[in-house]
Structures are given as C-alpha cells and as structure tokens.
Amino acid sequence: MGNAGSMDSQQTDFKAHNVPLKLPMPEPGELEERFAIVLNAMNLPPDKARLLRQYDNEKKWELICDQERFQVKNPPHTYIQKLKGYLDPAVTRKKFRRRVQESTQVLRELEISLRTNHIGWVREFLNEENKGLDVLVEYLSFAQYAVTFDFESVESTMESTVDKSKPWSRSIEDLHRGSNLPSPVGNSVSRSGRHSALRYNTLPSRRTLKNSRLVSKKDDVHVCIMCLRAIMNYQYGFNMVMSHPHAVNEIALSLNNKNPRTKALVLELLAAVCLVRGGHEIILSAFDNFKEVCGEKQRFEKLMEHFRNEDNNIDFMVASMQFINIVVHSVEDMNFRVHLQYEFTKLGLDEYLDKLKHTESDKLQVQIQAYLDNVFDVGALLEDAETKNAALERVEELEENISHLSEKLQDTENEAMSKIVELEKQLMQRNKELDVVREIYKDANTQVHTLRKMVKEKEEAIQRQSTLEKKIHELEKQGTIKIQKKGDGDIAILPVMASGTLSTGSELAVGNYVGSVPGATTSGPSVPPPPPLPPSSDTSEAAQNGTASPPMSPPPPPPPPPPPPPPPPPPLPGPAAETSPAPPLPPPPPPSAPPLPGTSSPTVVFNSGLAAVKIKKPIKTKFRMPVFNWVALKPNQINGTVFNEIDDERILEDLNVDEFEEIFKTKAQGPAIDLSSSKQKITQKASSKVTLLEANRAKNLAITLRKAGKSADEICKAIHVFDLKTLPVDFVECLMRFLPTENEVKVLRLYERERKPLENLSDEDRFMMQFSKIERLLQKMTIMAFIGNFTESIQMLTPQLHAIIAASVSIKSSQKLKKILEIILALGNYMNSSKRGAVYGFKLQSLDLLLDTKSTDRKQTLLHYISNVVKEKYQQVTLFYNELHYVEKAAAVSLENVLLDVKELQRGMDLTKREYTMHDHNTLLKEFLLHNEGKLKKLQEDAKIAQDAFDDVVKYFGENPKTTPPSVFFPVFVRFVKAYKQAEEENELRKKQEQALMEKLLEQEALMEQQDAKSPSHKSKRQQQELIAELRRRQVKDNRHVYEGKDGAIEDIITALKKNNITKFPNVHSRVRISSSTPVVEDTQS
C-alpha cells in the first residue's frame, strides 16, 4: 500500500466499506498465493509483513477480501486524461465551466489513489508513458496562475505585455529560465519536450487567465498539494519531485493561495523538505524563483506579509513560524545562518515577534521562543570573542606561571626527597646505635643478675658458717668434742669418749677453709659437724669484692686443649670449634678487570647498566635510501628496555625489502646496484691500496673516524691519557665497536713483520695498526666510557633510589593507610565469614579486586561503599593518599637493575683505581678518583638504605621481597589510590544527581498537585509526556532519531514537526543524502 506505516488505518478504512456476503475460502495453496500477491501489493516493511504472515487462514482470507474490494477501479491514465482535458486551451469557456465542476472531485480521488494504492499503481502514474508528475505540476501552475500574477491588476496592459501567440504554459516555462537545478534523469522531460507536449495550447493567454481564475476559487490547489505530498511519501516519488525542475517552485508559489489552510499545508511540506539533506538549498532556490515571479523586493517578503495579515488563523501562524525557525536555524554554515536571520530581521520579524510575545496560543509561543532561543546575537558574539581573546591571553599567562611553578615544585620535591633520604639515613643510624645500646644494656643486666645471685649465695654461706661455729662451741662446752690445734695451722676436732679419753682414730683434719664445708659431719651419727674456723682476710676481701666463687665450689673444668692450626677462615675457639666442621671457602671474588683484548667479543662495553651488545651487521641496499631522523638510544640505555627483547633482523627476513626500497628510494637514481659488479669496481679502483680489514667494517670505521675529525695520532694519544675533552664519550662508545679482534691483530702483525710498506695500506688499516698497539686498549677504552658516563649515571640512579626510600618509608609509616586496610579487612571478613571463615590479613593484590565486587543492583562496587564509609565514619583518614609520597615514581623503578648498575659502577671504579696505581702520574684519573669516590660511596649507601627500606616495607605488608619487586609492590598502591579517588568522584556525582532528581521530583509533585486541583486529566497526560521525555533523554541522549530510508518518511517528518515542536537546532545540522535509492531523513529534535 501507499504509506508503509499506515496499516492499521488502512484496515480501518477497509472495514468502513459496505461488506458484502463473505466468499468461500479457497484451498490453502491458492490462499497462500493470493495472500502473497496482496502482501506484495501492500508494499509493507519486513517486520509488518512478517506479522501478517503469522495470521491464521481465516484472517488472511478476510484481508484478501478487504484488499480486493478496496482496489481502485480507475487506472492512472484515466485521471491523467481528465487533467489534460482541463488544461486544453482549445475548449470553449462554456464547455470548460461544465468540465471543471468535477475537477476537485477528480483530484480528491487521485489523492486517495496515490495515498492508498499499492506502489505499482503509483509507479505507473509516474512512468515515462503517463508522465503524471508533469501533468500534476502543470495543473497546479494553471490552477494558481491567476492568483500568482494577479491578472486583474495587469488586464489593461495585457495586450502589450503578453504575446498572443505564446501559450500560458510556455510563459510559465520562461519563469524558470534561470533555474540552475539539475534536470531529472528519467523522471521528467526536458524544456523542448515540455514545449512539444504542449503544442496544442494555441489560444491567447487571456482565456487561460480567466479559466485559471475560475479554478482558483475552488480547492484544486489544496488537493494538488495533497497529491504531491502523497507522491513524495514514496522514495521513488520523492526523488522524482526533488529532481523535477519546477515541482518545488510551484509548491512554493502556492503560498499565494488565499486559503490559509492551503498555505499552512505548503509550509509544513516545505519545512519537511528543509530537513532532508540537500533540501534546504532547494527550498531557498524555490523562494528565489518566488521572488522573481511575484516581483518581491526581498526574499520571503510575501511570506512575512501573509504572516502579519493572517493573525486570525493560528494554525497558519504556527506553520509560518515553524518554517521560519527551520529555514533559518537548520543551516550548517554559521555565517549563512546569520545572513538568513538578518533577511527576516529586515522584513520586520523581530518587531512583530515582540508584539506576539503575549499570544494566548501555546504552540505559537513555543515556536516564537524557539526562534528567539536560537537567534545569533552578532554583537554579543563579538564581545564574547574579544572576551575569549583576553581569556586566552590570561590562560597563556597562567599556563606559563603553572610551568614555572611546576619546575619549582619539581625542584622542591627533589629537595624534599633528598631531605627525607637524609633523615631516613639518620633514623637508621640511630636505630643501629639503639640496637647496640640495647645489647650493652642486656649484657649489663645479665651481669648484674649474676652478681646479685653470687652475693645472695655468699650471704647464705656466711650464715651457715656462723651457725656451724655456734654449734661447735656448744658441743665444746658440753664436752662432746675437743678442738686441738696442729703445728701446720690446721685444727682437729676430737670426740670425747664416755670415759673422758680422746679418740684418736676419729680425728678430723680441718684445713683453713673448714668453715666453708657445708656438709661436713662426724663419724658418729649423733655428733654434729665441727664448726669451721673463721675465714681468712683474703677470703673475706674476695667475698666483699664479689668476685670470688662460693666456698668449696666444684673446681673449674680443666682448660681446653689448644685449638688446632686455624685453616682459613679459622674456627671459633673452644669445644664448639673442635666439633663443628670448618665453614666452606668463600666464593672467589669477581674478576678485577675485563679480559684482555682478543679473549672476548669487541662488542663488550663496560659501563653502568650496560650489558654485552651484539653488533648489528650493516645492510647493503640496492638503492640509496633516505635518512630516518630518529633519536637513537645509546647502547648503555637499552638495558631493561623493550628494545633489549626484540630482534629487528628477524623481521627483515619476513618483509619484502625490494618493494620497500622501491617505494622509499631517493630520487634521481639509476637501476639497482649489482652488488657483485660494484665489488669488482671497488676492487679495481682500490687496487693501489691494500685492505686488511673486512670491507664493511673498514667502511663503517671510516665513517666513524670522519665524524671525529681527528687524526689517528690525536685519537691514540687521547686514549692513552684518557682525554675525554679531545674524544667525546659518544665517539669513544662508537670506537669501542671497532676494537681489533684477535684475527685482525694477527693479520696486522704479520703484515708488519713482513716489513711491507705502511703507505700501501688504506687509512682505516693504518689507523687500526696504530690503534691496536695501545697497551691495555680494552681497559683504557672501558675506563674512558666509564668516566664519561659516570656523572650521568649518578644523576640517573640517585633519584630512583631516593624515590624507593621515600615511598617505602611513607607507606610503612602511614597510619591512615593502616586504617583503610583495617576497614577492608573487616568488610572482607564480614562477607566471607559464612563461607570461608575469617582471615588475619590479605595480599596486597586483593586491593585490585575491590572494583570487581559489585552491589546487587550493579550500580556501585565495594570500593565505592568503602569510600562512603570512610567519608561518613572515618573522616580523619579520608585523605590517606596524601601521606603516600613518591609512590608513582617508585613504581617506575627497577630496583634490581639499579643495584646492578651500582655494582657496575663499583667495578668501573675499581678498574680505574687499578689503572691509576699503574700510572699514578695521570692527573685526570687522580682528579676523577678524588672527586667521585665519595659520590659513589654515598650512592652505595643510598642503595643499601633503599634495599633495606624496601625489604622492611614489603615484609611489613606480608609480602616476599624476593618475589615482589618495586615494579609490582608500588603499582598496587598507585592503582588503589587512583581507583579510590575515582570512586570518591563518582559517589559525589551520584549524590548530586540524586539530589537534583529529588528536587525536580518535588517541584513536579508540587506542580502536579496544583494542576490536579484544576484538571486531573491534564495531570495524567503531563506525567506521561514527562516520563517519555525522560526515557528519551536517558537512552538517546544527544543522538538524533534517524528516519529509515523507506516509504512514509515525509509523513514521519511532518508528524514529528507537529508533535515534537522542534525548538533546538545543532550547530552542525545533520541531514541525509538524497539518493535515487534510499533517502534517509533525520529528526533534528535534541
């Protein structure tokens, strides 16, 4: 059917007809065939066709019957013949009056057929045979001819101004002589064809004007526009109308019709065409033609005149204002937009809109406000531009200030980092001193405890001695024992028998220290032990000093045998030394000097952070290639970079280098170089010189020597005395690639022993001869490279070590971070306790999982929740990340490589010292060692502190320092802080959005309550509209709705214009290209 989107309305129209008796349903096969024919005739989109195919047979048969009853009986040529009959100028006026009475009805039937018939009928109407569009446009021109030219005002001069021999249609054709629109291809006829088709129009144009005046009093113009609108609703018809040289012009001329309803219809149609890509230019061209035909002084003059005069017809005023809004503000070029705006300003639009600002029509007020909202105030724009220029200057000034402040901040950060490192050093030193003091205190405390124990034991011994003495005296008084002194100073305790005689057999010898024997007893069980003598003065004195052992203590063990001869290293003395095996020998120290020349590859370069670099073979190209001016890394800079892991030579094997050379070779070159012939020529040319080096190596050496601009003597002398002023370090590193190999040295020495003339050698060979004679060449070149790069290496390594130290200390000492981890641990245990049980800690990589754990509604993550908890409950730790200093810098440091670089520097320094001991007269080495040994020592101290500080903080967080380098440890905190800040921002944004939405809802509720009191139905309708608008804003946002390339697009645009009240236009208006296949139209509503 005609309109692809009007299936339901068509079915309603079908039911409106008088339905005769229902015919019997045919067989299913025949039913499906006829249903397929009906579907093809209806020209429905695929989705609606699929819907109809799902009908049961009963509904399909009803649809077939309705469709067949609805078929238009008149073919297209019937209407075309009737319209041509009205246009025949040979018919008499009386006969014309009789014919034209049914013209409006014929046009109405034609409009219904164009709108409701299948696409085949419309294509037949428009084909080359019928040329229905041409006939319809000609009839429209004829119907409004009298109104357009106002023949009443020019009737008196018609004889002199109108050529009687020219038909009315040809005079209309002349109006479009200046049209530059492209002629339709296959859809319309040329000017000469049009003239030949109208050859029968031979009556004077006076009668034509009178007939046109008669037709203009009817609704024929309005219905003609409806017919053209129905044609334009098809892709095929729309393309024909757009490419027709006069169709749009005639539609625009219809604005002269006196019926405001017709004029509103015309403006709606023209506004819809404006929204099609390329349509705006066609509409402006039509109004240029309107200006010429109607004699306007300015374009749109008649339109503004009708807009002012038809103030009693709101629909026309809304259509006019909407058309003005679209034609002015739907332009891509801003200057052209201002130009169109000024056209209407000159016609008095601004003043008239000021009068209409209090109009009672809401629709008109919306369009007026839309125009005013989109107006460009050039003066204000100029002022804004000037303000912008001033602002840009201010911005530039502020950016410069920011740049200076950034430099100062960087310097301040470096100074602060250095101070932090120094304080950390002092702290570590104080901690070491504290550990020593604690050890001394521990030892002293142990000694004090031992002495107190000894004093206590001595006091107990004295007490026992006093007790024993008392008992001995008592026994002596009782006569039980008798004390007898001997000549040697000992005393004897003799028991007294019952008969009063002494028993000599039981005599006890007691020495000077008898009093100190606590367990001494007599032979008789009833006799108490004799009391000892008082201690001598020596014993008392020793006891007072607290150094003597307790009396009668067991004798000390015999002294250990002398230790065996100590093997290196010697064992510990004592029994442990005798039993424990000797420790293994220490590993041999690293070699103190690199191998001598000839024992290793000449590509080895000894320097900070520099590993063995493989020499890349030079590539011989067939053509001269342009130079790629990249910034190359030095050999000592590729260690640890991505370039250390890639092999470009392998890539070249996969590429088509011949094609590459052909594409990028330099201009003005002959054919490709034959490598074999070129080698022969070189050999012939250099036959007078003897070349001992390999050709490519000699060539590269020559290039390197030319860069230096020094003679061989100067270079060798500078190497001998380590003169880096004469030979820059870059040249030294380049020259190290050409250290003579063992084979080259043999060849050179052989040539020299044979006493061949050196003059026959090439410059490169003579240089290599002299170069190879330098003593310890490899060591000297290595030392020069080391000295030249030492300062740069120190400056590169020191900030990295400082960053590790500062970041480690700040993370370990941050109490706020500790609180954050405590919160995370608590929430994690709460979530996992029912399944996995509580834990006591977690790995740091678990922090990355906070973003993966989402809430039930998927709107926030666990990290968002933690951010909210911290802000609400623990505000004191909200800015915990401010306590983490230099973490990002530390994350970029490879501590392992830095420590290796420090070791390499130490090896280089040792090599330099050894060289200086051999040649202590070299002032350059002396000054270098004097000024830089301290720097290296300080760097080594920083490296030790950095290693210790990092190990401490890694262990502090439960990680293993061996498996967790800084490049893994610190980025965890960097990512966590970044994600935490983003979560804070998103929480704040969501809070603002919820607050704004709540305020909006409260306002809407208050407004709806007011409207509810007035009109409940209005409240319901408004709620629905706001809900739809909100859904569109959320889902579509700034994307414009795109009308698909299908039939019915024009109707969709016009419907959108009526419903949506387009009020906003983008700066760059998007239209759809007009193509002969699929024109797509966009709605501009934002």
Swiss-Prot record:
Residues 526-535, 551-574, 581-597 have a biased composition (Pro residues). The keyword Transferase does not apply. InterPro entries: ARM-like, ARM-type_fold, FH2_Formin, FH2_Formin_sf, FH3_dom, FMNL_animal, GBD/FH3_dom, GTPase-bd. It comes from the Eukaryota. Coiled coil: none annotated. SUPFAM superfamilies: ARM repeat, Formin homology 2 domain (FH2 domain). One of its GO terms (biological process) is cortical actin cytoskeleton organization. Keywords: Lipoprotein, Myristate, Phosphoprotein. Residues 615-1006 form the FH2 domain. The modification Phosphoserine is found at S188. Residues 1038-1077 form the DAD domain. PANTHER family: FORMIN-LIKE PROTEIN, FORMIN-LIKE PROTEIN 2. Belongs to the formin homology family. This is Formin-like protein 2. It comes from Mus musculus (Mouse). The gene is Fmnl2.
